[in-house]
């Protein structure tokens, strides 16, 4: 079976092809969110991008954020609902959120050089999804004697080994540069009502730690819904559990269930109409004149 792919525009007007988010991914995300397992949720988001992004490119955190938004739009829903404590529902278009982030993106890469050791290091936005501020996560590339390595394209063990070989003097310069760029630009992402007639602005920072809660909010759903959809598709529609988990998307599951509900309603309405048609007049003397 050939997987359906769709294009996603990321930073610097680049394009990547992605496969759809399946029920197995969505269910696992809901489990991690419900258990508040932030560390493993970050790891799983990274694994989902690695699996579903067909085009292999050097991706920073913003690219990955945009890809996750696209997966949410295509495979789940293009609408984000925010419910406030005062029970006000705000409806937002995820496509508009993604567009706003891309329009306000600006390259933030800076270079640290050491002519003594012939080393050049590029630092900038973090390249992994994280709920913690990991300083060395902001090192993009290291070039030593003309050989350049992109750290986000190698394993953690290889990164640690390369970083351990850097002279202490340049390591200090790198840390200094990273700390100077700690405060990233903030943009107004959207406005929402938190009480009747009262609005607030939600700001987006180009820093993975500050936006992790937003990412969780965008993907949050009721885990019971996932189990309910699974039950209906498997027991009522006779779709195998494997096919449901690994070949169907959340939005496809809901469409199938809605179709089933419509058919059941039509059958019930037809039965009621038939019963009403076949009803005999009640025996009696009739109405008085």
Give each language-model segment a name.
Residues 1-272:
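An amphipathic, hydrophobic-aromatic interaction surface with interspersed Lys/Arg
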Residues 272-289:
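Short acidic DE-rich linear segments
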């Amino acid at each position: 079976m050939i997987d359906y792919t769709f294009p996603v525009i990321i930073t610097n007007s680049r394009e990547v092809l992605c496969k759809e988010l399946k029920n197995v991914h969505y269910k696992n995300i809901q489990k991690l969110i419900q258990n508040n397992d932030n560390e493993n949720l970050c790891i799983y988001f990274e694994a989902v991008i690695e699996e579903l992004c067909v085009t292999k490119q050097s991706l920073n955190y913003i690219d990955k954020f945009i890809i996750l938004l696209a997966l949410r739009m295509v495979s789940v829903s293009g609408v984000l609902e925010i419910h406030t404590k005062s029970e006000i529902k705000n409806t937002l278009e995820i496509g508009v959120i993604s567009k706003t982030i891309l329009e306000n993106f600006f390259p933030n890469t800076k270079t640290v050089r050491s002519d003594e050791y012939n080393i050049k290091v590029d630092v900038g936005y973090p390249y992994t999804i994280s709920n913690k501020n990991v300083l060395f996560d902001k090192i993009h590339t290291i070039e030593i004697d003309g050989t350049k390595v992109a750290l986000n394209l190698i394993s953690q063990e290889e990164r640690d080994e390369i970083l351990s070989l850097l002279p202490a003097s340049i390591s200090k310069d790198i840390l200094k540069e990273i700390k100077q760029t700690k405060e990233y630009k903030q943009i107004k992402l959207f406005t929402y009502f938190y009480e009747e007639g009262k609005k607030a602005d939600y700001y987006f920072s180009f820093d993975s730690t500050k936006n992790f809660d937003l990412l969780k909010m965008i993907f949050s759903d009721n885990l019971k819904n996932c189990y309910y959809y699974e039950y209906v598709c498997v027991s009522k529609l006779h779709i195998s559990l494997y096919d449901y988990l690994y070949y169907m998307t959340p939005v496809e599951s809901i469409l199938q269930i809605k179709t089933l509900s419509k058919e059941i309603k039509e059958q019930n309405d037809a039965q009621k109409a038939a019963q009403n048609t076949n009803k005999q007049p009640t025996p009696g003397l009739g109405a008085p004149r």
